[in-house]
């Protein structure tokens, strides 16, 4: 494992200089989820949530979050993203439903897009919670994790199941 590079000679935080890093295509896929009641699942599926199209709004929120990651993660470099795709899948679990969220982010640059994908997945889940909390505040946001990344000096990564 490499040493941390986000500290200067005085031990204080710094943004890493990436100007000498090779420009390559970089991708990242992050996942999150939110567990909801059958009532919320039905209301989302039938577009009966008062705040509007939950999945449509959450998808846009995820894309916006990916684009603004450097505004909320202090040492994250601002990146020109080439693409962001937020997708959903439902999984029934006993009497509840889990909304699975997957975010794919792509750029061509000197640093990776893992944080953008993770931020987008998190914000997508938070947006679903916000839009549905009037129905039930007991929703549970699940684990958020990096599934895969490609490109860059550290090489490719694929999470073990």
UniProtKB/Swiss-Prot annotation:
Active-site residues annotated for this sequence: 130
Lyase as UniProt keyword: yes
Alphabetical keyword list: Lyase, Molybdenum cofactor biosynthesis
EC primary class: lyase
GO MF, any single term: cyclic pyranopterin monophosphate synthase activity
Its EC number(s): 4.6.1.17
Family matches, as CDD domains: MoaC_PE
Pathway: Cofactor biosynthesis; molybdopterin biosynthesis
Coiled coil: none
GO biological process, one term: Mo-molybdopterin cofactor biosynthetic process
Catalytic activity, as annotated: (8S)-3',8-cyclo-7,8-dihydroguanosine 5'-triphosphate = cyclic pyranopterin phosphate + diphosphate
Pfam families registered for this protein in UniProt: MoaC
Record function comment: Catalyzes the conversion of (8S)-3',8-cyclo-7,8-dihydroguanosine 5'-triphosphate to cyclic pyranopterin monophosphate (cPMP).
Family (UniProt): Belongs to the MoaC family.
Subunit note: Homohexamer; trimer of dimers.
Protein name per UniProt: Cyclic pyranopterin monophosphate synthase
Native source organism of the sequence: Bacillus cytotoxicus (strain DSM 22905 / CIP 110041 / 391-98 / NVH 391-98)
